Amino acid sequence: TEMGLKPERSIEVVSFADEEGWRFTKGLFGSRGILGKLEPGELQRKDKDGITREQALIDFGCDPQKFRESEYKPGSIHCFLELHIEQGPVLDIANKPIGVVSGISGPLWLTVKLKGMAGHAGSVPMAIRKDALVGAAEIIVALNEIANQIPGAPTVGTVGTINVFPASRNIIPEEVTFTVDLRDIDLERRHRYEKQLMDKIESITQKHQLTYEISEDTN
């Protein structure tokens, strides 16, 4: 070091990308990679634009054929310390420079697709509409209410993307697809809230005469 100090153990620095798995819907790729725990087909996963993870790595200047060279054998690491930005306003509001993580909120990722019936916005009476976007809006509000049941709890619920078909100002939405991100440090509570959300989706779609599909996005 600049001060002439020699550490008792070697210090290495590693940087992981997309650990939450947003792009290829399976996270912890880098950390699982250095542990030798990648699964078959990992490199063939595609993002929303059809680009494989393998191609993305190559475009970034990486050589996927050298992954094995990056593996750490069990027992070869004495300790691991992760430094991370907060990604939130809590420390700033509390005027604190640093915090120590005591738990991580595991995410539940869902994709919800609602289907109703399209029609002209000016001629279909409100009483007989099957508006998929109205149903989606009520489900989104329900998710927010579910996540806010216990004030101060680390539960968070987010709808980050929403797509409407046919997406025309004068046509009643026939189909809506949106994502759900539900997180909580307490896994039992998250499971309970997931059940509440499923019940809400069922009742809301019945009320608006909609059909629905739900897929859990692997992470």
Label each region the model flagged.
Residues 172-173, 208-210:
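Flexible hinge/switch segments at interdomain interfaces of large molecular machines
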Residues 1, 13, 136:
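Short strand-loop-helix active-site module centered on a catalytic nucleophile
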Residues 12-14, 213:
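A structural signal for isolated positions on well-ordered beta-strands in alpha/beta enzyme cores
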Residues 213-219:
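An extended, acidic, His-containing surface patch that forms the Zn2+-binding/catalytic region
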Residues 19, 23-187:
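Midchain, well-structured core segments that form catalytic/ion-binding scaffolds
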Residues 192-202:
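Short amphipathic alpha-helices in soluble, non-transmembrane regions
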Residues 2-10:
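Flexible, small-residue-rich helix->loop connector segments that border functional cores
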